[in-house]
């Protein structure tokens, strides 16, 4: 386009941001290539020569992998050559901006458009590999003696690389045909689920290089076998909210399910579990040490890995090192806890609030719409000749009558909320939050006396039926009564496996069937427009509102 009065041509946006040609990155033995890619920017990485891995999962040679909104590191044990190039801008999905809900981000100046990228010679990968070999020795001993395998707890502050270590240990275990159960106790970001969930998954097959942990069951082809997570909903960011009165029983319920799986699955029992924790537990806040002790006890932890905190390591050594575990067989087998300090990788970077917001929005978008970014690696690995290079899902929108839904909301007051969010009348020990009200005190007492049954992982029936977790007298769950609140719009609601007549404690402790996204609320007509991952009627189950966390998600649908 010519500018008035000047014989000049304004460069078009396509020419101004034309991608640079691919760049080759050569890595020497024992080094890694660290990179950061913004949301809305796509880079393509291909392994040309040698061997390399991303968080323990090997890259296939001559296959192109795509990354967007990622901070990662590709490591090589023997040296390799990578080709890094720019990909197309992430496509929009039903009005979603290419860069996620926050909008597109300008392409970086690094190779392929990375915001930052460099080669590092000093890495802690040898330490992490040694941990894997030590765990493998314990697994071999467990198989020979009939004991349980190692139960590993990973602790450390925010942005210390805890999840990366969990991925590495999981990937190395699956390489030697082990089946670890991985537990995510961090509600700030989901594992095979949306943010605000605590999950447990048995990993039998390889992990996905591009998707991180992989993907849960979906309608469509998948190059990597899907994983089957057991999901619990904790719609709060901090596990210490209300002094941990909500987080603690959910952790107990999840631990009961995991132990039930190990009791029924010989491979899982021999391999053990890997528990990833939120950084909030390592900040020394009141109640954090008590919560760590609760996790150590419930999961019968045998190995505690501490990353990036000398103070926390000292406390863990004092409280747990060489102490007996809480396992039932600890006395007979003299099973004791080992505390190990690991170095924090220099590649760990701070993830600001804007980036974490993009991560949450991306996980929620992927849950409903799939991953629209093309991947030639996924197409090459797929067994279907007609499969596409991306997984695009088509969620189902429907109108729901608010009066027919049993929606609950946590009424925990925090400093960030308005005073009108807090209703002391809902926190009593009475039956005011039972669906429909009522005065069945005898039924409530009978429920407390009834043994709790652990919800097993998919495909496994738990044999543990007599364990009874502590029953809280005050469960801060309140049923949301008509008219439908306008703040329900643009938020997630979780459909539990609890019936609509369940008590507040049963709703809190129930596993999750799936999630709905509330796109619109019509308070006058008593209708809500919701987005579901599958079509059909919404099952008659108790529903929990994720008002506090992951909070409002604007612009998911037009």
Swiss-Prot record:
User: Which sites bind ATP?
Assistant: 32, 71, 159-164
**Pfam families this protein is in?**
Clp1, CLP1_N, CLP1_P
Question: Which family, according to UniProt?
Answer: Belongs to the Clp1 family. Clp1 subfamily.
Compartments, as annotated in UniProt: Nucleus
Q: What is this protein called?
A: mRNA cleavage and polyadenylation factor clp1
Q: Where is this region: Disordered?
A: 1-25, 418-455
Q: State if ATP-binding is listed as a keyword.
A: yes
**Summary of the function given for this chain in its UniProt record:** Required for endonucleolytic cleavage during polyadenylation-dependent pre-mRNA 3'-end formation.
Specify the superkingdom: Eukaryota
Per the UniProt record, the lineage of the source organism begins with: Eukaryota, Fungi, Dikarya, Ascomycota, Pezizomycotina
**Which InterPro entries does the protein's record reference?**
Clp1, Clp1/Grc3, Clp1_C, Clp1_C_sf, Clp1_N, Clp1_N_sf, CLP1_P, P-loop_NTPase
Q: From the UniProt record, which GO molecular function terms apply?
A: ATP binding; polynucleotide 5'-hydroxyl-kinase activity
* A biological process term (GO) from this entry: mRNA 3'-end processing
HAMAP family reported in the protein's UniProt record: Clp1
Q: Which UniProt keywords apply?
A: ATP-binding, mRNA processing, Nucleotide-binding, Nucleus
Q: How does it assemble?
A: Component of a pre-mRNA cleavage factor complex. Interacts directly with PCF11.
GO terms for cellular component: mRNA cleavage factor complex
